[in-house]
From Swiss-Prot:
Subcellular location: Nucleus; Cytoplasm
Protein name: Exportin-T
Originating species: Arabidopsis thaliana
GO CC, any one term: nucleus
Keyword ATP-binding in record: no
UniProt gene name: PSD
Tissue expression profile of the protein: Expressed in young leaves, growing leaf blades, young floral organs and root tips.
Biological classification of the source: Eukaryota, Viridiplantae, Streptophyta, Embryophyta, Tracheophyta
Keywords: Cytoplasm, Nucleus, Receptor, RNA-binding, Transport, tRNA processing, tRNA-binding
């Protein structure tokens, strides 16, 4: 070995070679690459070196040089490289016994040689090296080595240039078109003939070579004349290969790949259909029943599915009755095998089962009636869906415990099933009776298997039923159309195997909930429904996830059945006694509880039932007491324990108090205001006593946010439930909620005040008179008069809280103003905050980026003007307010803010704001009369450079009664004024 060869070998070394030595070797190789004579060096090494590392390095270097420097190479150098690598590929060995043969090297070296030739073809064919393919074919008689090399060159050309499976540059696309056009004219027929001859000659003696040639041919079918391969010579040969048991699977599979390429070739459907007919594809149907893991079964499966797709496409695109009949016959012929492939075999990744089946089902939609064969196909499609949606048993334990693996598999299957369920519902619309019978039979088969090992089958059958229900109309569900009247009773009265598994239990309960419309109409099944939820299939299920989900679904069922459950109250409470006891005593801090699974829905469900007026008053009182008493006791005990709890135990005690409050809140949702205040005040008294207990939580732990928010939620609830009877509790409640409130807590506090104002209107005046000054001082201490930035961007969490507080303040002020409570702003305690409030509302009405907020502020001004300003020339109710409105609001908001280019008239929200601004101007004229008009004419309009005549026209419009005309004129005025300011328009 010379120095270069040694350096190349070291640079490829991956073992324990010194890193410094390897780096030195790589550097040396790179230096050699840069020498002007590098092509000669590489060619010489390729002829004489037998080291595969050296051969590969030289070929790679040649390819790099050609790609980067071809245009700058001399003609002699180009010719030298061309002749040399072509001679190597064609086995033209120089007369030297020490010469190496690159084409007899390992595959990676031969592939690299093929890539070098493909690169030369890229630059030189057909203008410089027009005979490359014809010259190469003259050497094919030398046997397998050259034939193999020829195929590798064609494959490299496909990979590097022609195939559209890879992204191509515009230049590459242009070169590919040039190469293909030249090959079609010059040599493709000869190449196709060579493929045929080689495969015919070597199919038995060298199956690997035959498979290589067939794979090469497959790549070219998409762009050569189809007649060169789809003819009386090639097609029989290919099917002979596919059907020959004595041949290797590799050859048979490669032949199937060629037929698939013919089938998939882009063609006019008028030409494609006869081709598909002549193939007589039924000859290979039996091959898919072999070993599903074999390469041949995989290739034939891909052929059949590809064939079916093309037949279906022809059926869609051809319009004549004859061609449609032919295509449907072909489709009917191949479909049973396609269904078999879908159910038993590994489907090719390029084939979309759902897309194909949806396409087929769509061809059946317009038919007046389905034939027997089509109905059979529908059943087979449903079986495909059932098999596809089955979980893999290997994940059974993971899915039951819902560990990380189980969660990932459930998420994956949930996504995977979406399209399959779309297909199911589509089939259900085309053939509802067949679909229902299939689901019934699937359920029956699942039930017959008493083995727990049938979990996946049972879950799949129940999932089919659940998904099918999504497309049913309410009327069909109520009446139990088709065999639904048989399916639902079967669902309710059957003990399904595998019910202990989480997946089966969940989908079973989801099904009952989905088909509740049927049960509402058939109340004889209510005991079965209750049994499913109350026994070990639901709330008493051994799996925590099931029992919690059952609580939520039970609540939904109760909401639908309501009064029909009154006769079963005792049974329900008796069955839930242990569950309720567990919920009120368990350590909730040790559980990760979220949303609908936190157990509170059981209390909501019970509240809905016992809150009905159909329940006798005495019993209702007993039931409520039975539930409220232990929950209140839990809160009282928790308060005592939390006071003395260690830092570790404190969160646990707080969590238990928190859940008890949530449960009480949920329980109260079943009781309405009329019941608890008018017809059964004793119930109202119990809720008042409960409210007393909960308010003590605020006294004991005012700064524990979870407790504070839950108590606030309960107060919200009691406002709706107790109505005005809640008034005596409000001062104490509001005082506690207001104490030491942070901005975030103030937001929640104002939400409560908004509810109270909307509920009680002016009746809340006295309470609001006391509360508003405290709210105002808190807020105006942290929010400046000109407001906070309205777009948070990259701001701190603290700033976000302040922005949210400011936003809620606008809502709060708007609610006060629009519920006839604006006098609250004028009380002695509140008067000090009037100016900062007005400045903030003014600034916001002009500048806030949120148009809806600006509109609310304009509406505040409108209401205050109406409330605080009498008719023209009367004494002012709020000294200085009129001047402030005319000079600040009318000018800055109603004129300047509208003139700003950001005020976009084409935006719907902005247009609504503009309407409010027009209303404000109209109200100002009604209240201030000529004083307002004079200010517009003498100050506002001149400052905006509005011509006198246009200003006068606007004032005339303002004094009229046509507000729509006023709005249109003012918009036109503003738009013209903007143009004038741009210097592109002058008023005349």
């Amino acid at each position: 070995m010379d120095d270069l060869e040694q350096a190349i070998v070291i640079s490829f070394e991956t073992g324990a070679v010194d890193s410094a030595l390897k780096s030195q070797a790589v550097t040396y190789c790179q230096q050699i690459k840069e020498t002007p004579s590098i092509c000669s060096i590489c060619i010489e090494k390729l002829w004489f070196s037998k080291l595969v590392q050296v051969q590969f390095w030289c070929l790679q270097t040649l390819q790099d040089v050609l790609r980067v420097k071809y245009g700058s190479m001399s003609l002699d150098e180009q010719s030298y490289v061309r002749k040399s690598v072509f001679s190597m590929a064609c086995l033209e060995v120089i007369d030297n016994e020490n010469a190496g043969r690159v084409v007899e090297g390992p595959p990676f070296v031969k592939n690299k040689l093929a890539q070098v030739l493909a690169t030369l073809i890229y630059y030189e064919y057909p203008l410089i090296w027009s005979s490359v393919f014809l010259d190469f074919m003259l050497h094919l008689c030398k046997g397998a080595v050259v034939i193999d090399m020829f195929c590798r060159v064609l494959n490299a050309l496909d990979d590097e240039l022609i195939s559209l499976d890879y992204p191509r540059t515009p230049e590459e696309i242009s070169v590919a078109a040039r190469v293909k056009d030249a090959m079609r004219q010059q040599c493709v027929p000869q190449i196709a003939r060579a493929w045929y001859d080689i495969v015919s000659m070597y199919k038995n003696s060298d199956p690997d070579l035959s498979a290589t040639v067939l794979d090469c041919m497959r790549r070219f079918v998409s762009w050569i004349d189809i007649g060169l391969v789809a003819n009386d010579a090639f097609v029989p040969l290919l099917f002979e290969l596919i059907l020959s048991d004595g041949l290797s699977e590799q050859v048979r599979g490669a032949a199937a790949g060629c037929v698939l390429a013919m089938v998939s070739k882009r063609m006019d459907p008028q030409s494609k259909l006869p081709l598909l007919q002549t193939l007589q594809i039924s000859r290979v149907f039996g091959l898919v029943s072999g070993d599903v893991d074999s390469d041949l079964v995989s290739k034939v499966s891909a052929l059949l599915t590809g064939y079916a797709v093309e037949v279906l496409e022809c059926h869609k695109r051809l319009n004549s009755e004859d061609t449609k009949a032919v295509s449907m016959d072909l489709l009917n012929e191949v479909l049973p095998s396609v269904f078999y492939v879908m159910q038993k075999c590994e489907v090719d990744s390029t084939f979309s089962i759902v897309q194909f089946l949806l396409g087929y089902v769509s061809t059946l939609k317009g038919l007046p009636a389905l034939k027997e064969k089509q109905l059979l196909h529908i059943t087979q499609i449903l079986e495909v869906i059932r098999i596809q949606i089955c979980y893999d048993p290997m994940y059974r334990n993971n899915l039951n415990s819902l560990d990380k693996t189980g969660l990932e598999e459930e998420d994956r299957m949930s996504e995977f099933r979406k399209d399959l369920f779309v297909l199911l519902r589509t089939v259900g619309r085309v053939a509802p009776e067949v679909t229902q019978h299939f689901i019934r039979n699937s359920l029956a088969n699942a039930v017959e298997s008493s083995s727990e090992s049938n979990v996946e089958e049972v879950e799949a059958a129940l999932s089919l039923l659940y998904s099918f229900g999504e497309s049913m109309t309410e009327e069909a569900m109520k009446t139990g159309s088709g065999c639904l009247s048989e399916l639902i009773p079967m669902l309710l009265t059957t003990q399904f195997p595998g019910h202990s598994h989480r997946l089966v239990a969940l989908v079973y309960l989801e099904n009952i909930t989905r088909y509740m419309k049927f049960i509402q109409e058939n109340s004889q099944y209510i005991p079965n429904v209750l049994g499913a939820f109350l026994d070990d299939r639901g709330l008493h299920h051994q799996n925590f996830y099931v029992s919690r989900r059952a609580g939520y679904l039970f609540m939904r069922v109760v909401k639908l059945l309501k009064s029909k459950l009154v006769p079963f109250i005792d049974k329900i409470l008796q069955n839930l006694q242990d569950t309720l006891s567990q919920l009120t005593t368990m350590n909730f801090a040790s559980r990760e509880l979220t949303g609908t699974e936190d157990g509170s829905h059981i209390f909501e469900a019970i509240g809905i039932i016992i809150g009905l007026e159909d329940v006798p008053a005495e019993k209702q009182s007993d039931y409520l007491s039975l539930l409220l008493t232990p929950l209140c006791q839990q809160i009282e005990a928790g308060l005592v324990q939390a006071k003395v709890a260690s830092s570790e135990d404190f969160p646990v005690k707080i969590a238990n108090i928190q859940f008890a409050i949530v449960a009480i809140n949920a329980l109260s949702k079943g009781f309405n205001e009329r019941l608890v205040t008018a017809s059964r005040p004793g119930i109202g008294l119990m809720f008042k006593q409960t409210l007393d207990v909960l308010l003590r939580v605020l006294i004991e732990f005012p700064k524990v946010e979870p407790l504070r928010s839950k108590v606030t939620s309960f107060i919200h609830r009691m406002v709706d439930t107790l109505g005005s009877a809640v008034f005596p509790y409000l001062p104490k409640a509001l005082e506690q909620l207001l104490a030491d409130s942070e901005p975030k807590e103030m937001v929640g506090f104002m939400v409560l005040l908004n509810q109270l104002i909307c509920k009680f209107n002016s009746a809340l005046h006295d309470i609001l008179e006391e509360v508003y000054p405290v709210v105002a001082v808190r807020i105006f201490n942290v929010i400046p008069r000109d407001g906070l930035p309205s777009r948070p961007g990259a701001v701190t969490e603290e700033m976000r809280e302040l922005i949210e507080l400011q936003r809620m303040l606008y809502t709060f002020l708007h609610v006060i103003a629009t519920h006839d409570l604006s006098s609250v702003f004028l009380t002695p305690k509140s008067r000090a905050y009037l100016d900062p409030m007005m400045q903030l509302v003014l600034n916001t009405s002009c500048n806030h980026k949120d148009i809806t907020v600006r509109k609310a502020c304009v509406q505040i001004f409108i209401k205050l003007i109406k409330d605080w300003c009498a008719e023209p020339y009367s004494e002012e109710k709020v000294p200085g307010f009129q001047n402030f409105v005319i000079e600040a609001f009318a000018t800055n908001c109603c004129l300047y803010s509208v003139l700003d280019k950001s005020f976009n008239f084409s935006d719907a929200n902005t247009h609504a704001l503009f309407g409010e601004i027009i209303t404000a101007q109209k109200v100002m004229y009604e209240k201030f009369g000529n004083t307002f008009l004079m200010h517009l004419m003498s100050k506002s309009f001149p400052s905006a450079h509005i011509p006198q005549d246009l200003a006068e026209q606007y004032c005339q419009k303002l004094q009229g009664n046509d507000i729509r005309s006023l709005k249109s004129y003012y918009q036109s005025l503003i738009e013209n004024l903007r143009l004038q300011q741009n210097g592109s328009h002058v008023f005349r």
